[in-house]
A protein has these predicted regions:
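Helix-biased detector of long, well-ordered alpha-helical tracts
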Residues: 1-336
């Protein structure tokens, strides 16, 4: 039997599975769809935006990760994250009061920081897992005229990127491969890389809501597993477009470059929470970049959307090459 590798399901298989469940409820505005970050349901005056996402690559501050990665997906639809539910699956013979209290504290502090209400969930100790898993469920709301869906992106749109890539991957590797990194680069380097979850930070809620307030945004996408390259693929898949991306415009932090070089992994395919992709009319690009900058968020134009027939191209060292694709995230070669 051929078993699937760690990571996301094969997209062609996922498309076939999604097609088995046609949406008949007219109140479902956005259902399951590759390239969209959340579902959208009509709730009268506003839309309810709903998302679920687990945290599996790390156990460090797992409650904090669960809140932030789900909030990011809600915000990428232009919505404000409001209500959070969590399913905690805890390993038998490894779970104690200290572990559970730490996870709960992380969830509570993280929701409070984003003005989100923890409103429910489920806890369970299982003999079938060997580490804690948190599955987050986030709900948000948005004015109907401010909803952002990626199907609205079109050829000619500018593509912007907030902050830099592989922020989450850098932080996780620094936490999981501390000894090797300390030996190679020293203690200060390790601490800086581990602190990436706070600075530059994994949250893009502020990035997304500021951009959506400043201009008419055609698409926003929160690249996560599979890195920036997969995020761009998902955005263009949803919008039926192609893209030209300039490698030299993509911000890659020094720590990220050094970690990727040491472990021979590609930062374009490394889990990328903390960055936000934005597609918009070029006339609004400067306005959005300036507003984000005034709020302490770096934002760079990294390319343009093109016709779908032109595919995904990366301009690297003056040459166009095909955008690399990653069936599994680069981090899986180091952490399983």
């Amino acid at each position: 039997m051929n078993y699937f590798p760690v990571g996301k399901l094969d997209l062609k298989l996922l498309e076939r599975l999604i097609a088995l469940n046609p949406i008949k409820d007219p109140r479902v505005i956005v259902g399951p769809r590759i390239g969209e970050d959340a579902a959208v349901i009509d709730f009268g005056e506003k839309y309810l935006v709903a998302k679920t996402d687990p945290v599996t690559f790390t156990t460090y501050r797992i409650g904090w990760y669960a809140v932030n990665v789900n909030a990011n997906d809600i915000a990428a639809m232009g919505a404000t994250p409001k209500w959070f539910l969590a399913t905690l699956l805890l390993p038998e013979k490894r779970t104690n009061k200290k572990l559970v209290t730490q996870i709960f504290n992380d969830i509570i502090k993280s929701t409070q920081a984003l003005n989100i209400t923890l409103c429910g969930g489920h806890t369970e100790i299982s003999g079938k897992i060997d580490r804690p898993i948190v599955v987050g469920h986030m709900l948000g709301e948005v004015e109907k005229n401010k909803l952002v869906v990626n199907t609205n992106a079109c050829p000619g749109d500018d593509v912007l990127l907030t902050k830099g890539i592989a922020i989450e991957g850098t932080a996780i590797i620094a936490r999981e491969k501390t000894s090797a990194l300390r030996k190679e680069f020293g203690e200060k380097f390790v601490k800086r890389a581990q602190a990436f979850i706070n600075n530059p930070g994994l949250s893009v809620v502020k990035d997304a809501l500021l951009a959506n307030k400043a201009a008419r945004i055609n698409a926003m996408h929160d690249p996560t597993e599979g890195g920036l390259a997969t995020g761009i693929f998902e955005l263009t898949k949803a919008s039926e477009t192609g893209a030209i991306i300039e490698m030299k415009k993509i911000q890659i932090y020094k720590e990220t470059r050094q970690i990727c070089k040491l472990f021979n992994i590609d930062p374009l395919g490394l889990i990328a929470s903390g960055a936000l992709l934005i597609a918009l009319d070029p006339k609004d690009t400067k306005k959005v970049i300036n507003i984000l900058a005034r709020n302490g968020i770096t934002c760079t134009k990294i390319g343009k959307l093109t016709k779908e027939s032109e595919g995904l191209r990366l301009l690297r060292k003056g040459e166009f090459i095909k955008m690399p694709m990653f069936k599994v995230d680069e981090i899986t070669s180091l952490i399983t």
